[in-house]
Amino acid sequence: MSLSRINIGSFRNITSASLQPCDGLNLIYGQNGSGKTSILEAIYFLGMGRSFRSHLSQRVINNDDDKLTLFAHLIDADRDCKIGLRRHRSGEIEVKIDGEKVKRLSTLAETLPIQVITPESFSLLFEGPKARRQFIDWGAFHSDPHFYQAWVNTRKVLKQRNQLLRNQSSYNQIQFWDKELVRYAEQVTDIRNQYVDSLNVLLKGIIGVFLPRIDIKVSFTRGWDSKTDFAQLLENQYSRDLAAGNTGSGPHKADLRLRVGNLPAQDALSRGQLKLLVCALRIAQGKLLKQQLDKNSIYLVDDLPSELDAQHRQLLLQLLTETGAQIFVTAIDPQAIVDSLSSPPNRMFHVEQGLVTVIE
């Protein structure tokens, strides 16, 4: 799977641009503020309906326009697909796939799976369990067709239960929702657990390449003690939850734990080693998608030279190219990337003040 055409309109400082990337590695270079990262961000927006740099989508719309427009032609082994997206400053979003309106943004993620490695990617290890749950759930969503609905149902039930808690409702009023929560929580947790088990098989090998002398343990925690009956736990914690006004245990508290010995990885590893660990997680997730669904992710790698030394930059690019996936890499100095490759990039683009030029 690869993008054969990308059209970008009124996205940050890119007024209008059209790219025809190749399979394999596409190198995008330019000075800071030129717009090279905005190209990666636009591709991500097409796959997720949001930015990886800002939670406020209005900020990515060019100041001279009231909407952004994105289009991509996606070529897969068994189908060609055209994706169009328009986001208005008012917040309204329109998505079409092959000319048909799409109601759920999750359809974008299903159609265009994307892996991102940026300077901000390390939030996966430092910003608490939410980012790691999102990482697990991205994979669970792709690996099991039943996950999305179970996840949606869990969120709805939690919202209802928390509202009742804030209203100081009796346990008799909450008991029905507890039964529903237990049912959906078990579905979500089982799929998450199976996914992490499968991911671990691939992850160990990749971590062994990046960090060969370090034993890193990766485990899934469900959000409550696995030896405790969840229904009984909810009843036992009712008074505490009532005082807090929210549900203290459950699948919304799940986490992916990464440890070196008895220490969390973020305390035991250097910044450079943590960068490599995040890269390993992203590559493993993409490889597992390929293994399970015979579908490649598209990799977006921003500002690679500043993130890794030459040796590990070369190793990362080697592992990425071996996946057979389409890759977009940005850099200020293109030579830093070219020197790390065993063969030239498949295509190069230069970006200056939002203008994109292909380098023949």
From Swiss-Prot:
Residues engaged in binding ATP: G30, Q31, N32, G33, S34, G35, K36, T37
One record GO biological process: DNA replication
Keywords: ATP-binding, Cytoplasm, DNA damage, DNA repair, DNA replication, DNA-binding, Nucleotide-binding, SOS response
GO MF term list: ATP binding; single-stranded DNA binding
Cellular compartments per GO CC: cytoplasm
Its job: The RecF protein is involved in DNA metabolism; it is required for DNA replication and normal SOS inducibility. RecF binds preferentially to single-stranded, linear DNA. It also seems to bind ATP.
Family of the protein in this entry: Belongs to the RecF family.
Name the UniProt record assigns to this protein: DNA replication and repair protein RecF
Organism field: Shewanella frigidimarina (strain NCIMB 400)
Name of the gene: recF
